[in-house]
Amino acid sequence: MNYLEGVGSKKGGGGIASESQFNLQRRKEVESLLSKGENVPYTFQDEKDDQVRSNPYIYKNHSGKLVCKLCNTMHMSWSSVERHLGGKKHGLNVLRRGISIEKSSLGREGQTTHDFRQQQKIIEAKQSLKNNGTIPVCKIATVKNPKNGSVGLAIQVNYSSEVKENSVDSDDKAKVPPLIRIVSGLELSDTKQKGKKFLVIAYEPFENIAIELPPNEILFSENNDMDNNNDGVDELNKKCTFWDAISKLYYVQFFFKQAEQEQADV
């Protein structure tokens, strides 16, 4: 330790260190031991790509104080940094950062592959199912939106009845939810049904259910009481259906655009 420039020192002789100088030197030594001699860069410095650091989120700001870029915290000493690195907040942020990087590395191509495989599983499960001839219990009620007076339908289908053996061979097949589809009369072979429209509810291995609908356009935005079905194959299934896999109850609800609304749109 050099005390030549201390108070009361003489040229050529060891000076007397003041208490403040001694404390400053001791803090520097402690900081060096805690940081293991690592050179902490400033936030405005460009890091080298080949530089490997044990604490890559710790930097010095313009005033020389230690900061954690990940958690946006400032620390007066390296001992405070050590406590922060071992704390819950920094650990959670590192975990979130890792998950974010993993998702971004998956990319759009990886997500598309995952969705394709999921659809293939559903198709294979449906192909292996066989119709058992069971007609589920269906309840239909007319509902009215108190906000604008729109009239709609609320449908409950009970799929909790027993099915024949070997109709469902695995849990993966049971996870395939029911679905709905609007079928126009033009798609039917019966010429008497050409001007009609039907709602078809399908859930293998049960029989399909067909419900005749009025010609009015369906409103998706009015279906506020129904939780979104994220497993739905399209907008109709996502916004107008709810599948309770535990009770095996399937709910469908939507409203129709009234004549006044259709004229206003025109």
UniProtKB/Swiss-Prot annotation:
Zinc-finger as UniProt keyword: yes
Cellular localisation: Nucleus
Gene3D superfamilies according to UniProt: 2.60.40.2690
UniProt cross-references to Pfam families, sorted A to Z: SF3A2, zf-met
BP terms from Gene Ontology: mRNA splicing, via spliceosome; spliceosomal complex assembly; U2-type prespliceosome assembly
One MF term in the entry's GO annotations: zinc ion binding
Keywords in alphabetical order: Metal-binding, mRNA processing, mRNA splicing, Nucleus, Spliceosome, Zinc, Zinc-finger
Metal-binding as UniProt keyword: yes
Sequence segments annotated as region (Disordered): 1-21
GO cellular component: catalytic step 2 spliceosome; nucleus; Prp19 complex; spliceosomal complex; U2 snRNP; U2-type prespliceosome
Zinc finger intervals, Matrin-type: 66-96
InterPro entries recorded: Matrin/U1-like-C_Znf_C2H2, SF3A2, SF3A2_dom, Znf_C2H2_sf, Znf_C2H2_type
Reported function: mRNA splicing factors, PRP9, PRP11, and PRP21, are necessary for addition of the U2 snRNP to the pre-mRNA in an early step of spliceosome assembly.
Note: Present with 3460 molecules/cell in log phase SD medium.
Family per record: Belongs to the SF3A2 family.
Subunit structure as annotated in this protein's UniProt entry: Belongs to the CWC complex (or CEF1-associated complex), a spliceosome sub-complex reminiscent of a late-stage spliceosome composed of the U2, U5 and U6 snRNAs and at least BUD13, BUD31, BRR2, CDC40, CEF1, CLF1, CUS1, CWC2, CWC15, CWC21, CWC22, CWC23, CWC24, CWC25, CWC27, ECM2, HSH155, IST3, ISY1, LEA1, MSL1, NTC20, PRP8, PRP9, PRP11, PRP19, PRP21, PRP22, PRP45, PRP46, SLU7, SMB1, SMD1, SMD2, SMD3, SMX2, SMX3, SNT309, SNU114, SPP2, SYF1, SYF2, RSE1 and YJU2. Interacts with CUS2.
Protein name as annotated: Pre-mRNA-splicing factor PRP11
Gene name in the database record: PRP11
